[in-house]
């Protein structure tokens, strides 16, 4: 004990000396470099967009009217991997650039969207405009029927609707839709088996405190509209829903005006929805907290023209896309590509509840656009002050929009060592700083804010993390006990699943790879030395996932099974297959609902924790932004990707789900907190580095000689 105490005191004294190193907050600067080649995934320029828009209008005779034949969206169509690899690896030509356009044809009785490919760019009046089919596998590739409301919108109908339901809204809330005293949340516009089209609306109280809190203010009353006709003057109210009962318009009017009717308790806006500072302040919280600083020039290189980054042994390109947000391409580690593409595919939120709108609610956030929803970051809060801030861009119907400071890049200390060891016998202690390089972006989609991180580590690992905040979409509390907790006067937290699907196209020593599966299992065995006595222990069961038939995978309950993308044709010098293992580092879920009534075939990619398929140029994405319009025959039905093909030494793609089962509670008010609503996946070298842990080459480590006297 005496020796231990003396040793400990000596160690503390030595470390205390090292901590006296002066720290200077010097302004950071970017190290500018030139990328090895053009960024073939770069977003459309304004000039490219203008050319595409002009040729579409010219060749398809388009207008700008809301319900007519018009452009809905134009954005960049990423090149095929096969073409890019010819360019990157075989000195081929740079792939030609093409645009994708979604065009609404609103003139037919049943309007529809048609996808087009335009190019090569730059476009002129003679540039080819042809239906885009190859990325889609629906029955009618590249064509999606839409409801009358989706084509025409609801704004023109609002004055008429307000007048029709005024007797109800006056009686219940002493206001009208036209007056703005109440509003509503739109449900899902649906095609029905009898050829009608309907939609539910859930009434909301208005936010009055200057905060975006309307989703916390449900009023417990819903109505269903028939929207079959292309003329909104023919739309009408089909049903009302209140207090777990369905009413016809006539019966609901009679009920509301009956002498014994009890109006629903309203959710009323107030300080409880505000994120302004409230009293009393935390103890000593008025003092300045610790703050991360940069002590010198940035330790990464950047080509801002091509969106190319180098950090330590890593390099990669990034690109922002209207639908999917920020993606990474051609991730190289130690001069070898390890990931061709790392990208968000869909951000799905599936709700449940007793009322029609939450019961039917499935939000496909690429429909809104994760890139369109990228926001300007708040320096010092969303990212460190010393981070590098970059703009992003997205294209829509009318042009290219620049979002300033939408991406941040920075290094940070993880506040725990990457590795360490103290040896009393040999008289030393060693430790290495765990420095992480982060590429961060945030998308605010309606009421929710999603923070995404791509993290790079000294040990060759990459992590993808997502955190959620913002205002929950609440439900009315009456009758909703099986779907949420009562969290305010008349408010229930509406249970929902968040599922964020990522594509990870790994290339380990080339494109031809396999999936190694290793399971830790209990074992009872007799060893030659155990003299016939059984020994209870454990062992490794090694194998491979050889077919797409077996590649719909859920994480083992105790994480006893690990999966690694390996190259069986390039064993290391010890005879093991080099690879990158992938695993969850935070809660990572799949969709709870089986055979979702509201999601149909549009969300098969969310039904397991991960999938592994052969890479194909005609299967570039797990989902499409327009899948929600026709869930029975979506543009991309992911289930069709799983057609039993071999996974033995093929070009493989992982489709990995992150997210959380969210049951809101009182602490979700006013906003959900990111410390609990988060998920993460890690890709890490596994028998990939023959020389061992690469961090031994880092200058950010110390070896301290200990004195025992």
Swiss-Prot record:
Coiled coil: none annotated. InterPro entries: Cu_amine_oxidase, Cu_amine_oxidase_C, Cu_amine_oxidase_C_sf, Cu_amine_oxidase_N-reg, Cu_amine_oxidase_N2, DUF1965. Cu cation binds at residues 496, 498, 662. Ca(2+) 1 binds at residues 505-507, 651-652. Disulfide bonds join 383-408. One of its GO terms (cellular component) is plasma membrane. Its EC number is 1.4.3.-. Its cofactor is Cu cation; Ca(2+); L-topaquinone. Belongs to the copper/topaquinone oxidase family. This is Copper amine oxidase vicK1. It comes from Bipolaris victoriae (strain FI3) (Victoria blight of oats agent). The lineage of its organism: Eukaryota, Fungi, Dikarya, Ascomycota, Pezizomycotina.
């Amino acid at each position: 004990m005496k020796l231990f105490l003396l040793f400990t005191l000596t160690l503390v004294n030595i470390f205390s000396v090292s901590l006296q190193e002066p720290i200077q907050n010097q302004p950071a600067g970017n190290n500018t470099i030139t990328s090895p080649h053009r960024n073939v995934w770069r977003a459309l320029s304004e000039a490219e967009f203008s050319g595409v828009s002009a040729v579409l209008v010219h060749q398809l005779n388009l207008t700008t009217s809301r319900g007519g034949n018009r452009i809905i969206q134009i954005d960049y169509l990423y090149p095929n991997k096969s073409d890019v690899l010819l360019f990157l690896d075989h000195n081929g030509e740079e792939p030609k650039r093409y645009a994708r356009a979604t065009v609404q044809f609103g003139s037919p009785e049943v309007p529809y969207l048609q996808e087009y490919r335009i190019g090569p760019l730059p476009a002129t009046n003679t540039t080819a405009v042809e239906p885009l089919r190859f990325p889609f596998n629906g029955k009618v590739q590249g064509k999606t029927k839409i409801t009358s409301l989706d084509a025409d919108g609801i704004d023109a109908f609002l004055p008429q609707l307000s007048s029709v339901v005024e007797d109800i809204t006056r009686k219940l809330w002493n206001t009208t839709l036209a007056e703005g005293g109440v509003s509503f949340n739109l449900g899902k516009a649906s095609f029905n088996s009898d050829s009608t089209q309907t939609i539910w609306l859930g009434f909301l109280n208005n936010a009055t405190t200057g905060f975006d809190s309307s989703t916390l203010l449900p009023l417990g009353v819903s109505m269903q509209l028939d929207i079959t006709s292309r003329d909104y003057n023919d739309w009408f109210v089909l049903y009302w829903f209140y207090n777990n009962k369905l009413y016809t318009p006539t019966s609901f009017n009679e009920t509301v005006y009956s002498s014994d009717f009890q109006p629903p308790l309203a959710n009323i806006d107030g300080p409880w929805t505000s994120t302004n500072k409230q009293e009393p302040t935390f103890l000593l919280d008025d003092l300045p907290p610790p703050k991360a600083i940069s002590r010198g020039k940035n330790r990464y290189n950047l080509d801002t023209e091509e969106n190319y980054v180098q950090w330590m042994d890593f390099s990669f390109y990034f690109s922002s896309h209207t639908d999917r947000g920020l993606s990474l391409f051609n991730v190289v580690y130690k001069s070898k590509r390890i990931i061709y593409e790392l990208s968000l595919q869909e951000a799905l939120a599936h709700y449940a509840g007793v009322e029609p709108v939450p019961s039917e609610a499935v939000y496909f956030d690429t429909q809104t656009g994760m890139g369109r929803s990228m926001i300007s970051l708040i320096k010092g809060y969303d990212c460190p002050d010393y981070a590098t801030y970059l703009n992003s861009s997205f294209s829509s119907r009318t042009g290219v929009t620049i979002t300033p400071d939408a991406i941040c890049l920075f290094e940070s200390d993880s506040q725990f060592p990457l590795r360490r060891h103290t040896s009393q016998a040999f008289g030393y202690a060693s430790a290495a700083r765990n420095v992480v390089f982060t590429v961060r972006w945030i998308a605010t989609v309606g009421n929710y804010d999603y923070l995404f991180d791509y993290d790079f580590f000294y040990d060759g690992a990459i992590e993808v993390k997502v955190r959620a905040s913002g205002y929950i979409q609440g439900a009315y509390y009456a009758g909703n006990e099986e779907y949420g907790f009562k969290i305010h006067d008349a408010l229930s937290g509406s249970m929902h699943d968040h599922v964020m699907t990522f594509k990870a196209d790994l290339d380990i020593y080339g494109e031809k790879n396999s999936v190694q599966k290793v399971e830790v299992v209990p074992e009872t065995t007799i060893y030659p030395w155990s003299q016939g006595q059984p020994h209870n222990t454990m062992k490794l069961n090694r194998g491979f996932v050889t077919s797409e038939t077996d590649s719909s995978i859920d994480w083992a309950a105790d994480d006893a099974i690990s999966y690694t993308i390996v190259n069986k044709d390039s064993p290391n010098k010890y005879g093991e297959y080099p690879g990158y293992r992938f695993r969850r580092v935070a809660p990572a879920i799949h969709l709870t609902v089986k055979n979702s009534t509201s999601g149909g075939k549009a969300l098969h990619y969310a039904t397991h924790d991960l999938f592994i398929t052969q890479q194909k140029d005609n299967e570039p994405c797990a989902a499409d932004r327009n899948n929600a319009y026709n869930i029975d025959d979506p543009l991309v039905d992911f289930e069709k990707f799983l057609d039993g093909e071999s996974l033995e030494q093929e070009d493989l793609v992982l489709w990995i789900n992150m997210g959380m089962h969210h049951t809101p509670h009182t602490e979700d008010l006013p906003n959900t907190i990111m410390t609990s609503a988060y998920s993460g996946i890690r890709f890490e070298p596994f028998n990939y580095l023959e020389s061992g842990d690469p961090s031994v080459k880092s200058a950010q480590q110390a070896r301290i000689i200990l004195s025992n006297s």
